[in-house]
């Protein structure tokens, strides 16, 4: 297929137009007085949102080159959302500012490669300075403040998230669901969740929610594949006699064994569910052992002399309730002894201390969370479905932000942290061309606070100037239109969010600045309309109708 190629300034101008179109739609949502964006849906009511990444994801432009620019900035928003869960609008505003300033310099004849090097060095310095400014989160109140700010100044949501974290610990599992009522509530349950769902949808007990729920269930834990029905028969017969539900967790269940379980479930002979074991290799064995300790059962493994066909009921674990959907299994209130669980926790903590691998440490912490944490469910209520979707998205954002704050600490919010970190750039000793890159970043760092002020109906330049002349956490509270100490006023951002937004924005903007040629498919030309078919006899085509008047 034929291609169109654009070079130099022509291509950059098209890029810039696309970047501006997307960023201008996203940045109206920034800050406490940011506006909503309404998105048409092909079915159902329109979606109303104030979430930057949701707006960005909906944007596709007609012009292929402009669309390239828009899609690259969309990547900034979605990457920031993936890493930090919030800060998507800030990242978009930064990307637009960096590219816009950089494109002017390139158009004036400066070297884009040197500008990019300057940008990279500036961002590296800023990230170190943000970590330096950062304070660890100390208490319930600060967690609530982070949640409140991220949920668009909704204090109720901030308080609920802080309460959830307090109940299940920062390592517990918190999920967000839609409530049937108008109120937003918190439900907490002790339990362990792992990312494996049912092996067949026929195990579902609640077709509407596509979930299998087993109460007072036995748990068979096996570390190998089960494909032969004969091995399972003894334990199934004992289960049928006991009348209790059974969940089987094994490396895999396939063929004849799975088919038999499904048939027995459909006939109502057994209330049963089958799930793949979580993890891989040695980690899978360890996780199965965790489940066994939590539920008071044993891992049926030939390595320790247990065979599947010889399994007895006392080897099975037990739990008050098990919920399985297509992606996750949650075991609530396992029957394991407290002493054994604490022994297991102690062992995992010792392994965390000893390991030198970051990856292993992360996985061990996940296992620890599943043993000591619980499961908290935030049920989001609203008057209408449209409002519920918008509110649920805000709760999810706030949840990500609070987790990020617990991970890396907090900095003053409202764009103040960027202005305070800016002083670290004065110590950089770079070539003239690279210094231009640093200047681009300096100007871009003012953009979030300028946009927050503009969305609040105030002159952004005056606010930036006043905050720059202040010290420490002094900043502009757009919600109340006053200058305050941001930390004391509870206007705080997670360091991880501020850092990720800056890193992702500068990464994509830098790549766009150093792009010299753009290639896109040539649009197909619309062929001329085919002639209309001949009319009825003697009419000489439909045009002949004119003579009939």
Swiss-Prot record:
EC number annotated for this UniProt entry: 5.6.1.7
A Gene Ontology biological process term: protein refolding
Annotated PROSITE patterns: CHAPERONINS_CPN60
Entries under InterPro entries matching the protein: Chaperonin_Cpn60_CS, Cpn60/GroEL, Cpn60/GroEL/TCP-1, GroEL-like_apical_dom_sf, GROEL-like_equatorial_sf, TCP-1-like_intermed_sf
Catalytically driven reaction(s): ATP + H2O + a folded polypeptide = ADP + phosphate + an unfolded polypeptide
Main location: cytoplasm
Root EC class: isomerase
Domain of life: Bacteria
Record localization: Cytoplasm
Alphabetical list of Pfam families matching this protein: Cpn60_TCP1 (PF00118)
Record: residues binding ATP: 29-32, 50, 86-90, 414, 477-479, 493
GO cellular component, one term: cytoplasm
Family: Belongs to the chaperonin (HSP60) family.
UniProt subunit comment: Forms a cylinder of 14 subunits composed of two heptameric rings stacked back-to-back. Interacts with the co-chaperonin GroES.
Function field: Together with its co-chaperonin GroES, plays an essential role in assisting protein folding. The GroEL-GroES system forms a nano-cage that allows encapsulation of the non-native substrate proteins and provides a physical environment optimized to promote and accelerate protein folding.
UniProt protein name: Chaperonin GroEL
